[in-house]
UniProtKB/Swiss-Prot annotation:
Family (UniProt): Belongs to the NFYC/HAP5 subunit family.
Subcellular location as annotated: Nucleus
Complex formation: Heterotrimeric transcription factor composed of three components, NF-YA, NF-YB and NF-YC. NF-YB and NF-YC must interact and dimerize for NF-YA association and DNA binding.
Gene Ontology molecular function terms on file: DNA binding; DNA-binding transcription activator activity, RNA polymerase II-specific; DNA-binding transcription factor activity; protein heterodimerization activity; RNA polymerase II cis-regulatory region sequence-specific DNA binding
Domain of life (superkingdom): Eukaryota
Role this protein plays: Component of the sequence-specific heterotrimeric transcription factor (NF-Y) which specifically recognizes a 5'-CCAAT-3' box motif found in the promoters of its target genes. NF-Y can function as both an activator and a repressor, depending on its interacting cofactors.
Keywords: Activator, DNA-binding, Nucleus, Transcription, Transcription regulation
Protein name: Nuclear transcription factor Y subunit gamma
Amino acid sequence: MSTEGGFGSTSSSDAQQSLQSFWPRVMEEIRNLTVKDFRVQELPLARIKKIMKLDEDVKMISAEAPVLFAKAAQIFITELTLRAWIHTEDNKRRTLQRNDIAMAITKFDQFDFLIDIVPRDELKPPKRQEEVRQSVTPAEPVQYYFTLAQQPTAVQVQGQQQGQQTTSSTTTIQPGQIIIAQPQQGQTTPVTMQVGEGQQVQIVQAQPQGQAQQAQSGTGQTMQVMQQIITNTGEIQQIPVQLNAGQLQYIRLAQPVSGTQVVQGQIQTLATNAQQITQTEVQQGQQQFSQFTDGQQLYQIQQVTMPAGQDLAQPMFIQSANQPSDGQTPQVTGD
């Protein structure tokens, strides 16, 4: 190895002075070596043997070879560290970095075999920042929006519920036009009833597939018709209303049969005047709500089925959203 420091500066630092006196001091130590000095090495001999065994051509290693290699490696590392420390002092730092060792390797020819092992430019690949997008599906509560306008009236109902199906549709009826609901799978024959002059109400009752639905009108039952009026102060007033035989028969036909079956109804209003009708089907447990419009009024029918074997009243409520001119909005209760 070279014995010259290779520095031309007049004012030498401590590292440069140590490097200049390095090889004379090493040669003096080698001449004064004894057998006892080879027993203790600064570098572990097991690691030196492991490096030597990496060569496939090496079959056997003598006892003296690791000792000599350990001493040579110690001298080599000391010289390389001194040359790298000079570069550290030139940059006015007190910490030895990998870049300092790379600069020492490139400046001196005896370290050329380390250029591929210790590259000069320590380039770290940029880390790729992957954006993780999480789509949180909020809960879908049941929301109903009712919109009431002037004639022709339009009532729109929108509902969403997880695990439950709610259908909403809007139909426009022209004067003299008749619309018949298409029976779905499991529905019985539509029942048509005359309610008022120039107005027809058609009720279609649906039943689960494979089950028979029988509409029976209870004999001996008394029907009491009440008018429900909501005042400006929010109070609810009930006034008895007289209905003809045809309307009472229509109410009896609309009532469900006692049992555990759930009845799902569709109501369509056929009017001669131009109006818009909203059909809403909401099935919750054993309760069913149906809504239809008549002119500027919104009617809501609630049907409740009771378990079989219980002799309880089966109410059916028909209530209006606003009060007409004659002040008669029927609410029908079946006892």
